[in-house]
Amino acid sequence: MATGKPVVMIVMAGRPLTIGRQVDQAAAVLYAFHGGTMAGPALCNILTGKVVPSGKTPITFPKMVGQIPLYYNRHNTGRPSYDPPMLIDSIPIGCPQFSIGQSSYWLETPTEPLFPFGFGLSYTTFEYGSTRIDTLPFREGQGVGYSLSCTITNTGSYDAYETPQLYVRQLSGDLVRPLCELKGFQKIFIPAGETREVIFTITDDDLGYWHESHDGLSSRVWFATDDVDFRFAILPYSQSL
């Protein structure tokens, strides 16, 4: 690296590692996990450009060990975060404490991971359109259904696969719900310069969760969907909605 020649770092591991310092020094990172007996030819095809990479991270990569446990579908703390952190030397002398941004983290570490869940780069680029939602006819035993769609354009120079992901956030409810939840994904092939439409279908059951109550002597468990507002988005990787 001291010579200035670009270096591609290949990581073979079965779990996310804290590799922030190495990522800063490498020109690119290829996380191979445990690729099996054909890992060598597969990596060679990616590095030489025979194959355009299309993998997505199935886990969240932390910036540091202190962030663990770290997961995309965490609960909301109800407190705002401030990213990047406010440096103490940049705070004016004598200012009231509330002027520094009311910063608070859900963990006492940076708020963002090194690589979020569902993230992955390609040799090409993709542009996502707005998510559209349509209500489907009521079906006995399934309740109301919803069709969610968006267009994805390959704006780069290479034919490639992309994996759009459907995320849902429940804005209120009987219990605190995650900031976002993965409800579906698809892998689609999009030639360079072309546009494809991706469609997801979900029902009321896909938006429900398990409830539990106790009265001191017994407990009751049931599955239900809250009659509240939801937010939907088709995204290239997990983001807070």
Summary of predicted features, one role per range:
Residues 174-217:
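Intrinsically disordered, low-complexity Pro/Gly/Ser/Thr-rich segments with frequent PxxP/GP/PP motifs
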Residues 2-7, 26:
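A short helix->loop->beta-strand "cap" motif at the edges of active sites that frequently abuts
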Residues 238-241:
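Short beta-strand elements
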